[in-house]
């Protein structure tokens, strides 16, 4: 009897160890799949939160994956081999108002115009005015404070005009008018809390999904 009892205990122990190993392996696979998911999906989650606040197209932050590549307003990349090591890397230049629904897109010939843009959704604002003074030099005269200048672009999907701001009375002392960058949009007080909540929520969902699949639940 003692021998039979010991044999039964050992048999149960082997099964328990096998079950634990299966759970451990399933857990490792679930974590690995979750990391892959987050790396692939997180840029889209972040872009959705950014575009909910800022008037910029999602396609300018995350590539569509189809069609020919275009110059992006910025980029978002997720790195790390464990959930604890996952890190967000974002890059981007200061953007001109062209990216935020600027009007007019081209200067009306021989007329005064008011430049407007909507950086924050629902908040279209005046960013400059050009008064056609009919003075020598036209739009490049000293009295023209904000002007649209041609970029020389010949492509249908390119930018042909961008705004410049006069910095002094010197005719050539002008500077490209810029607004905000993708990194600034991501770290902004307007979006950062929502982004972190979205990342935590979605990561937990993906981990739970893969754990259930790995354990056959």
What are these regions (language model features)?
Residues 1-217:
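Short, Lys/Arg-rich flexible segments
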């Amino acid at each position: 009897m003692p021998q039979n009892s010991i044999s039964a205990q050992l048999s149960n122990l082997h099964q328990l160890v096998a079950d634990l190993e299966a759970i451990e392996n399933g857990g490792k696979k679930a974590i690995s799949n979750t990391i892959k998911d987050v790396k692939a999906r997180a840029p889209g989650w972040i872009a959705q939160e950014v575009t909910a606040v800022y008037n910029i197209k999602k396609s300018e932050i995350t590539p569509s994956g189809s069609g020919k590549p275009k110059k992006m307003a910025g980029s978002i990349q997720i790195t790390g081999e464990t959930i604890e090591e996952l890190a967000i890397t974002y890059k981007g230049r200061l953007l001109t108002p062209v990216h935020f629904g600027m009007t007019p897109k081209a200067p009306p010939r021989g007329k005064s115009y008011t430049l407007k843009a909507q950086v924050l959704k629902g908040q279209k604002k005046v960013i400059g005015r050009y008064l056609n003074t009919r003075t020598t030099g036209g739009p490049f005269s000293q009295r023209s404070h904000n002007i649209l200048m041609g970029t020389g672009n010949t492509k249908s999907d390119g930018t042909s005009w961008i705004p410049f701001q006069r910095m002094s009375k010197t005719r050539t002392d002008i500077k490209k008018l810029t607004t905000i960058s993708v990194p600034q949009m991501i770290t902004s007080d307007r979006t950062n809390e929502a982004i972190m909540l979205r990342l935590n929520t979605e990561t937990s969902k993906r981990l739970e999904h893969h754990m259930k699949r790995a354990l056959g639940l």
